[in-house]
UniProtKB/Swiss-Prot annotation:
Assigned protein family: Belongs to the gastrin/cholecystokinin family.
Modified residues (Sulfotyrosine): Y87
Protein name: Gastrin/cholecystokinin-like peptide
Organism: Gallus gallus (Chicken)
Taxonomic lineage: Eukaryota, Metazoa, Chordata, Craniata, Vertebrata
Main location: secreted
Amino acid sequence: MKTKVFLGLILSAAVTACLCRPAAKAPGGSHRPTSSLARRDWPEPPSQEQQQRFISRFLPHVFAELSDRKGFVQGNGAVEALHDHFYPDWMDFGRRSTEDAADAA
């Protein structure tokens, strides 16, 4: 019993010593190219000019994504076709009630 406790303490001390050391850097320094779009090494917040440049660069893309009519929320015919193929006997009650209302009109 004492041997197991002693080995456990030695093992935990060795693991703690290995985990506390800083990671060694690889020789040659694997340099990742920094992206001009995402800079996380700024010492201070971006200036007003930089904010305006980022906004003017990304705002059209955001508007294009938001105005896209083929979104998941509005439904997709391909998804409905797959659903009908894999679940032929399952009835969506919301869809059934809208179909019944359309048939009654």
